[in-house]
Amino acid sequence: VLIACATLDVHRVLLIGGGATQVTGPYTKVMDLLKTGLLADYGITHIDIAGHPEGNPDDPDPEQSLIAKLNWADTHGMHSRILTQWSFDAPAVNSWIERLRALGFKQPVHVGIPGPATLKALLRYATVCGVKTSSQVLKRQGLSLGRLLLINKPDRLISDLRGYDQLHLFPFGGLARTTEWLKQR
């Protein structure tokens, strides 16, 4: 993959890890790859690192893991930004960003949010992705059959978010539906 990145003049990569029940390569964590120096050897100068405002079932301390990666990037002259797991819980995301900023981290934060989707689809993805708080928020909206089939749009969530640099959309309701919603904004 790194040879292809160098050949194609790719300088930015998104680094995510975990979730696999069986490791298939030499690296069990993103930090293992970072420590090799291979990214810089192949021309990678910018890294996007996953952030988990609601925690991560595969990491007992995801905030410390993120901080370690950000510090590593700074120490090694690598540009970094944070792309978060999707969330439906604006207060949790806002508090998480505030904690990072209070610790002195200034990297751009791209907050992951779901595009328009049914409550049923959002609950399914919340379970798969381990997004606990968002799952609880969605369940509080009511689980009647009619409610499960309504399309939920992220407009209110967006208006409640603070301190982020950009949004990163997860098109759980389909790419066409998300694209149409974006055109109407």
Identify what each model region corresponds to.
Residues 1-21:
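A generic, well-ordered mixed alpha/beta core segment in the N-terminal half of proteins
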Residues 5, 69, 78, 111, ...:
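Conserved, mostly hydrophobic/aromatic
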Residues 6, 70, 74-75, 101, ...:
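Non-catalytic positions within long, well-ordered alpha-helices that form the structural scaffold/packing
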Residues 9-11, 42-47, 79-80, 105-109, ...:
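Short, well-ordered coil/turn segments that N-cap beta-strands
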Residues 14-15, 83, 168:
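Conserved beta-strand positions in the central sheet of alpha/beta enzyme cores
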Residues 17-18, 26-58, 62-68, 102-157, ...:
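Active-site pocket-lining/capping segments in soluble small-molecule metabolic enzymes
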Residues 93-94, 175-185:
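C-terminal helical cap(s) of enzyme catalytic domains, especially alpha/beta-barrels
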